[in-house]
Design a protein with these regions (language model features):
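Bacterial N-terminal signal peptides that target proteins for export
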Residues: 1-9
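Generic detector of low-complexity/intrinsically disordered segments
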Residues: 8-9, 16, 21, 153
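Short, basic, low-complexity termini and linkers enriched in Ser/Thr/Gly/Pro
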Residues: 11-16, 223-239
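Folded, disulfide-stabilized extracellular/luminal domains of secretory-pathway proteins
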Residues: 21, 28, 182-186
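N-terminal Sec/ER secretory leader and immediately downstream segment
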Residues: 22-100
Length: 239
């Protein structure tokens, strides 16, 4: 009897764990404005830069919309209507180009697009092009470190980061001025040694070096969140 109870408890525990993290993975982000900065530098960039961004997700393990996505990656390059994160301006409408793992099956590609849209919301409301590319993403094993990390999406986009250090304190009162553009479990700012987009669809290309404009982070979702997203889409309220 006691053994049966213990087995039942163990089963419930495993079930609860699977609900708590049905899908999880790594996230990278770069912006064309510094995200780790002081008020004076941020004021100098607002309305001038910060309308461009690259977002990337790599699934460590798990499923989305009932499709296993272990090891699959998707990246998005976008151009907004105003400095992203500025509370006094409207960045919408934004235009986006998606770069989907070329090793993914058609079902996986569809699920990756759904996952990215779930996280980025209105930023990916207007996708002008979806490309199949060899997307590679490497992040630190210790997720609380500030890099290094890198992401490449064929010849279209690239990110390379390094940790923040004392030389990155220019005015002495730097903070994480802008939060990440998506919901994350954990994130840290980093320096983007390279932030490049050479693809079509956005009406602009960029190559930036040495800006304090990157985030590394982790994401996860449970079954209840996925079920809610699917229900919303079925009702016509999702992307």
């Amino acid at each position: 009897m006691r053994k049966s109870v213990l087995l039942a408890i163990a089963g419930i525990s495993l079930f609860a764990t699977s609900l708590a993290a049905q899908i999880q993975g790594e996230y990278m982000e770069t912006r064309s404005a510094d995200v780790y900065t002081g008020q004076c530098f941020a004021n100098g960039e607002v309305n001038l830069v910060g309308t461009e961004a690259i977002l990337a997700w790599k699934v460590d393990r798990g499923s989305w919309d009932g499709v296993n996505l272990d090891g699959r990656t998707i990246a998005a390059a976008l151009r907004a209507n105003a400095t992203l994160g500025d509370p006094y301006a409207d960045p919408y409408p934004a235009k986006a180009v998606l770069m989907v793992d070329d090793q993914a099956s058609p079902a996986q590609k569809k699920a990756l697009v759904s996952l990215a849209k779930h996280y980025a919301g209105r930023l990916l409301e207007n996708v002008v092009e979806v490309r199949s590319e060899p997307v590679m993403m490497e992040t630190p094993q210790n997720h609380h470190q500030h890099g290094p990390a890198r992401m490449m999406a064929g010849s279209m986009a690239a990110i390379q980061t390094r940790p923040l250090n004392d030389t990155d304190h220019l005015c002495g009162n730097e903070v994480t001025f802008y939060p990440p553009l998506v919901k994350l479990d954990h994130s840290v700012p980093a320096v983007a040694l390279t932030d490049r987009y050479d693809g079509p669809g956005l009406g602009t290309e960029w190559t930036l070096h040495g800006k304090r404009s990157a985030f590394l982070g982790r994401f996860s979702e449970g079954n209840s969140t996925q079920q809610s997203a699917v229900s919303t889409q079925s009702a016509g309220g999702g992307d």
